Amino acid sequence: MPKAKFSLASREVKFKDQGRIEMARVFLSPPNMGGDELEYIKKVFESNYIAPLGEYVNRFEDAVKSYTGTRGALALNAGTAALHLALRCSGVKDGDVVLGSTFTFMASLNPIFYERCVPVLIDSDESWNLSPKLLKEAIKKSPKKPKVLVVTHLYGQAAKMDEICEICANEGIDVIEDAAEALGGFYKGKALGGIGKCGALSFNGNKIITTSGGGMLISNDEELVAKARFLSTQAREPLLHYEHKDYGYNYRLSNVLGAIGVGQMEVLPQRVKRKREIFKIYEDLFRGTDVEFMPEVEGGEGNRWLTTLLFKKKNAHLKVIDALNKADIESRPLWKPMHLQSIFAGALSVVDGTSEDMFERGICLPSGTDMSDETIERVVKIVKENI
């Protein structure tokens, strides 16, 4: 059997067999443990408190509150759960209109269906995020007065929150931030997710930090967070016996995963620093070529969760993705806009072709925080050879 050499720094596995060296697959954004997670998990097992809730869930929530500067945080089993509770706590009813970014992942908008609301989809502008201009148009065209806007901070980069929040404030529309990809990103000194009424974070396995699966609702509205906490534990009344006056959900995070989260929060600043370094390396290596990177809005400092770019020609990304895959390197197209998905057939979409154009020309490149600079150079070499 060949002997394997494991590099904890790069997760690159080299197998030496009769002079051959094979590199492990390079993933888009794999987990990267900080080192203390196992110790914290061990303490959870020693306490036998492995169920939802517990000391490490509390510590995880406190760490996120401290980092984001928000007054309330609720650890949950998914970012989608956080978005669902945010929408439920906003007071929407059957048939209410909820505005949302079209250039996003389906999980951003699934809660609209959970609450039997009516989606109205809004296109992006040059920032790749939701267009304030089209937001105004969508409000005018909406079949009824919108109650909520769910705005996505795409790929960890800030949307134009000053303009968006001002428009929504003037119209009496609550702003929920889908910051699932954006923990560690800021806009004019404020943490993404902590600017609107509330925000949702994700700790899925591919995010900048992970708890394997998980999410968090953050807000400066402590009453909203308290209501969400109540709903997340089956809406059980605080009595000796089980009493229920409303319906709730089983959305809480386990103490085991909370322990992972505590360890991950300890290394979040380093993870953000490395993500931004990776972007800068890509940017430098592609200098002089005909590609366009996702920009940063004025006042924004995103986490650069994934390095994304556009090629000049439509569908050029498909050849590149195929070439990278043959080299055992993962890459992906950009999100397919929601207004092109069959589930949204018939929904009002205020679009101008921006996200469709980006979808036809864009690619997500490997951006794992444990990638070596040499691996990034290898990725760029293959891309250049195939555009």
What do these predicted ranges mean?
Residues 127-211, 216-218, 223:
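Active-site phosphate-binding strand-loop segment of PLP-dependent enzymes
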Residues 100, 118-127, 332:
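Short beta-strand->loop structural element characteristic of the AMP-binding/adenylate-forming
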Residues 115, 170-171, 327:
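Helix C-cap/helix->beta junction micro-motif
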Residues 53-97, 111-115, 121, 190:
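Phosphate-binding glycine-rich loop
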Residues 104-109:
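Conserved coil-to-alpha-helix start sites within the AMP-binding
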